[in-house]
Structure formats: structure tokens, C-alpha cells
Amino acid sequence: MPENTIKNLNMLLVEEQALLRRTVALTARSLGLGTIHEAANMEAAERLLREHSFHGAVISIDCGSLPNCTYNLALLDRVRKGLYASNSGIPIAVMAENATAELLSDLRKRHVSRVILKPFRARVLLDAFASFEPLAPHKS
């Protein structure tokens, strides 16, 4: 992809681990991938999604290893319904510790473009951001 095509992309990273967020955001900027806006939790992500238009997002949906834990996919649903400033069809990748058949089915229904299983290297996130197509960031 030509450098000028991806240089101005605004992307969202929702991840509770501060070191991982900072590493990915700074590396993406230095590689010319665009600007990574960071959110440590869903509330911060919603605030950013209301205020900014994004070309793509990588969202951690960790459930942990708790028994009978269900993944919270409400943020994905709201993005896909067009309730935020971004185009409802933006590419979304999710990070999770486990990927059951049920979760993968739920993510497929929400048009999630990539599932990243933890643990992983920061490079995997950078590759996910680099793969996002530069869609129009605003709703039609």
C-alpha cells in the first residue's frame, strides 16, 4: 500500500494494558501507519467513538478465565449500527484470550475482520492496523 494512502488514518485501540497500547501507538506513528487513539476501557472507547471518526479499530474483548463468562460485544454492535461518528462498516479486529466456535460465529455476524488471540507480539497489532482499507471515515 502506498505510504500516503495510510499515513492519515485514524485508528482506535481498546486495550487495558498501558504498555502494549503505548508501544503499538508509538510504533505505528513512527512507521507512518497513522494515528492510533488509545482507550483503556469501553467507556473511554465510547467517548472517543462519539468524538472522532475512525478508519478502523482493534478492540480487546477479554472475558478472562472466569467460568460462565460471556463476552461483551455491545461496543461492536453500536459501531455496526452506526451510533458513532465512524462509518458503520469500518474494519474491526478483536483481541481475545480464547476463541470458541460460538464467539467466532458471533464475531462473524458482526463483520469482524480479524481475531487476534492473546498472547501475541505487538507486531501482530501493527499488521492488523496496516491491513485496514482506507474507507470513508464518516457515516453516509
Predicted regions and their residues:
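Alpha4-beta5-alpha5 "output face"
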Residues: 29, 80, 105-109
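C-terminal output helix
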Residues: 120-129
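Acidic, metal-coordinating helix/loop segments flanking the phosphotransfer/catalytic sites
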Residues: 38-56, 63-66
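CheY-like receiver
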Residues: 2-5, 135-140
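Conserved phosphotransfer microenvironments
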Residues: 56-86
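Alpha4 helix (beta4-alpha4-beta5 surface) of REC/receiver domains from two-component response regulators
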Residues: 70, 74, 94-114
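Conserved acidic segment of CheY-like receiver
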Residues: 8-19, 24-28, 57
